């Protein structure tokens, strides 16, 4: 049950009644009418912009509309007051019984409270991580993996049919570098000195690959030239790296539904098919691009190339898809890959890219818009950097030097749950500080602890109540005398719980799972605030001498626990029942 949707339905019904009464003209578009929490809680429980958005199309002053609407709304038994503010905003206060009833609603719904059907079963593809298969995942990949997986969980929670997908970048030059690096470890496995030349991957993680190559091929490759072993070693090393990456993802609680290979696009006609489709729309041509201003990108040539007319779909410049020597640019297989996703019948595509792919956003959106005839929206989320801190100092990494911090390093030091939660404590496009010391602190400054501690406190109340012989099942607590929850601090906590279904829908529509983490922190803050006030005001404690009052307060605590557990589930974090 979404209380905000319920009150919006009331508002639009009264606007319809005003139309029938001749107070408003017929045919008004009510889609922009919103009901939401006011910016300042002192102004009321909810606020609506109805009068503001209808003033111009109705030809009436907004305050005139607001005053007439306020009179009608105040007559509803759920509304205690409706006050016009400013130029025509309408602030509403709900009767305590509405809030008190929310506790029973939550307990009756259980883990379905907040679930939504706004996705309507639409098929959405969330592509994330897609790290080059050249080594273990590092901390930079962790954030994208967590954001992508949490987003997939959120969308499924809100009614979408979600596919998690990993695009294996195994068609470029980097996998040849991997093969050459692995071959040196193969030589090392035979007792020879490896030649880790400039540009090769020096990490020790390739030593097991060299040993595995030795086990499979013996010494048969040692005396052969690169042209004889490159393909086999590349495929062997790539598969071992992907197995390592799958294990890394599993350690983070991430499981992909589909793994797609870039290499599979070559030689199968898929790239040609995608570009032929664009050519049919007159979006492929031969031409010479003007030299770009500033830094010259690697796909620019001062000669004729095959170009995609991406400017026809919002890009700044047209983009090369085939070089003058006949080879494909990096963009060409990406177009083919996204065309493949379109032809698989997805209604929506989401890509989670690193911040260094910012220049790819417009061209990729242009390609999908063209290939789907505007039917399939593509949302690209850019993941900013993670800055590591340890012992109060920045901790830097270098992949080329083989000294980077891996996903396993992070998970082994702080755990999967802490890692996942912290990675969602900032919006994806903001740099995130990950302090190995602070994320394990038991203090209110640590958001992971703060939320988990709230859940642990709730469970401590339930345990004590059981020890006293109380039935604390959801079904029984839902029948409590909830009128006893009449303190403003208790009502404020319930009001925060009432925001959960609305928050889920907003987060899902905007593809922003960090909103869930932010909300959980706010909810935990309300719970801790009420708990701490109980230290000084005995009447606010969750366990009371009066069993009727006690049952009502325990019902409230349990309702908070239901929502916290639901939110943590979306984040992929296991709720803690007891702090140790």
From Swiss-Prot:
Superkingdom as given in the UniProt entry: Bacteria
- Where does the UniProt annotation locate this protein? Cytoplasm
Question: According to its UniProt record, where is this protein mainly located?
Answer: cytoplasm
Pfam families for this protein: Arg_tRNA_synt_N (PF03485), DALR_1 (PF05746), tRNA-synt_1d (PF00750)
Care to name a GO molecular-function term for this sequence? Answer: ATP binding
Q: Which PANTHER family match?
A: ARGININE--TRNA LIGASE, CYTOPLASMIC, ARGINYL-TRNA SYNTHETASE
Query: Which family does the record assign?
Result: Belongs to the class-I aminoacyl-tRNA synthetase family.
HAMAP family noted in UniProt = Arg_tRNA_synth (MF_00123)
In Swiss-Prot or TrEMBL terms, this protein is called Arginine--tRNA ligase
Query: The organism's lineage?
Result: Bacteria, Pseudomonadati, Pseudomonadota, Alphaproteobacteria, Rhodobacterales
Gene field: argS
């Amino acid at each position: 049950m979404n209380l905000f949707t319920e009150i919006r339905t009331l508002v639009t019904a009264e606007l319809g009644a005003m139309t029938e009464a001749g107070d408003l003209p017929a045919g008004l578009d009510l889609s922009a009418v919103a009901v939401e929490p006011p910016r300042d809680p002192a102004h009321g429980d909810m606020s609506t912009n109805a009068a503001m958005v209808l003033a111009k199309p109705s030809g009436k002053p907004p305050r005139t509309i607001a005053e007439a609407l306020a009179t009608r709304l105040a007559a509803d038994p759920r509304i205690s007051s409706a006050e016009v503010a400013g130029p025509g905003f309408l602030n509403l206060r709900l009767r305590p019984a509405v809030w008190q009833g929310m506790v029973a609603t939550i307990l009756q719904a259980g883990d379905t409270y907040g679930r939504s059907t706004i996705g309507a079963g639409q098929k959405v593809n969330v592509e994330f991580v897609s790290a080059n298969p050249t080594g273990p995942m590092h901390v930079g990949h962790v954030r994208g993996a967590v954001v992508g997986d949490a987003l997939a969980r959120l969308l499924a929670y809100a009614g979408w049919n979600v596919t998690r997908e990993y695009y294996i970048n195994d068609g470029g030059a980097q996998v040849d570098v991997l093969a050459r690096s692995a071959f040196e470890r193969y030589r090392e496995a035979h007792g020879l000195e490896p030649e880790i030349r400039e540009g090769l991957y020096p990490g020790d993680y390739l030593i097991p690959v060299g040993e595995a190559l030795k086990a499979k091929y013996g010494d048969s490759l040692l005396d052969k030239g690169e042209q004889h072993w490159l393909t086999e070693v590349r495929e062997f090393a790539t598969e071992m790296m992907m197995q390592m990456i799958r294990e890394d993802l599993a350690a983070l609680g991430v499981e992909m539904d589909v793994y797609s290979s870039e290499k599979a696009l070559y030689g199968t006609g898929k790239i040609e098919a995608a570009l032929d489709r664009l050519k049919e729309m007159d979006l492929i041509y031969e031409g010479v691009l003007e030299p770009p201003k500033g830094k010259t990108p690697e796909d620019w040539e001062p000669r004729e190339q095959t170009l995609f007319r991406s400017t026809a779909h919002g890009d700044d410049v047209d983009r090369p898809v085939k070089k003058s020597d006949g080879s494909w640019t990096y963009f060409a297989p990406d177009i083919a890959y996204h065309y493949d996703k379109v032809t698989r019948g997805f209604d929506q595509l989401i890509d989670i890219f690193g911040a260094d792919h910012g220049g790819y956003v417009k061209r990729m959106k242009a390609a999908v818009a063209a290939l789907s005839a505007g039917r399939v929206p593509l949302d690209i989320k850019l993941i900013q950097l993670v800055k590591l801190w340890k012992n109060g100092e920045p901790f830097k990494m270098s992949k080329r030097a083989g000294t980077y911090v891996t996903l396993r390093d992070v998970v082994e030091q702080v755990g999967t749950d802490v890692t996942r939660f912290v990675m969602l404590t900032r919006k994806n496009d903001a740099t995130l500080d990950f302090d190995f010391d602070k994320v394990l602190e038991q203090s209110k400054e640590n958001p992971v602890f703060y939320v988990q501690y709230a859940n642990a406190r709730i469970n401590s109340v339930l345990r004590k109540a059981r020890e006293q012989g109380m039935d604390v099942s959801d079904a029984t607590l839902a029948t409590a005398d909830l009128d006893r929850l009449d303190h403003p601090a208790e009502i404020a906590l319930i009001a925060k719980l009432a925001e959960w279904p609305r928050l889920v829908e907003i987060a899902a529509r905007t593809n922003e799972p960090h909103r869930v983490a932010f909300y959980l922190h706010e909810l935990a803050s309300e719970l801790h605030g009420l708990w701490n006030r109980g230290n000084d005001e005995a009447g606010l404690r969750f366990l009371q001498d009066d069993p009727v009052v006690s049952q009502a307060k325990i019902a409230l605590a349990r309702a908070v626990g239901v929502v916290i557990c639901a939110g943590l589930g979306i984040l992929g974090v296991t709720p803690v029942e007891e702090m140790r």
